[in-house]
Amino acid sequence: MLILTRRVGETLMVGDDVTVTVLGVKGNQVRIGVNAPKEVSVHREEIYMRIQAEKGGQPGSAE
């Protein structure tokens, strides 16, 4: 896992088309903004897991 340090207002790039910007830090919560093309899905992990479960398969499980 790559670990990066960013301050509020700073951005990191994922490939050529996705940017992740730190919008704010309050206590133990970090607000981030993700700018990605329409064809790239962006979800919180718990939402992604729910979508996968509804599709009938858990990521990483042997089927």
Swiss-Prot record:
Location(s), subcellular: Cytoplasm
Name of a matching Pfam family: CsrA
Give yes or no: UniProt keyword Repressor: yes
Q: Which UniProt keywords apply?
A: Activator, Cytoplasm, Repressor, RNA-binding, Translation regulation
- The answer to whether the entry has keyword Repressor is yes
Gene Ontology biological-process annotations: mRNA catabolic process; negative regulation of translational initiation; positive regulation of translational initiation; regulation of carbohydrate metabolic process
In the UniProt record, which is one GO cellular component term?
Answer: cytosol
Top-rank taxon: Bacteria
What's the main place this protein lives? cytoplasm
Gene Ontology MF terms in the entry: mRNA 5'-UTR binding
User: InterPro entries given for it?
Assistant: CsrA, CsrA_sf
Subunit relationships: Homodimer; the beta-strands of each monomer intercalate to form a hydrophobic core, while the alpha-helices form wings that extend away from the core.
Role according to the record: A key translational regulator that binds mRNA to regulate translation initiation and/or mRNA stability. Mediates global changes in gene expression, shifting from rapid growth to stress survival by linking envelope stress, the stringent response and the catabolite repression systems. Usually binds in the 5'-UTR; binding at or near the Shine-Dalgarno sequence prevents ribosome-binding, repressing translation, binding elsewhere in the 5'-UTR can activate translation and/or stabilize the mRNA. Its function is antagonized by small RNA(s).
Question: Which family does the entry's similarity section mention?
Answer: Belongs to the CsrA/RsmA family.
- Protein name according to UniProt: Translational regulator CsrA
State the taxonomy lineage.
Bacteria, Pseudomonadati, Pseudomonadota, Gammaproteobacteria, Alteromonadales
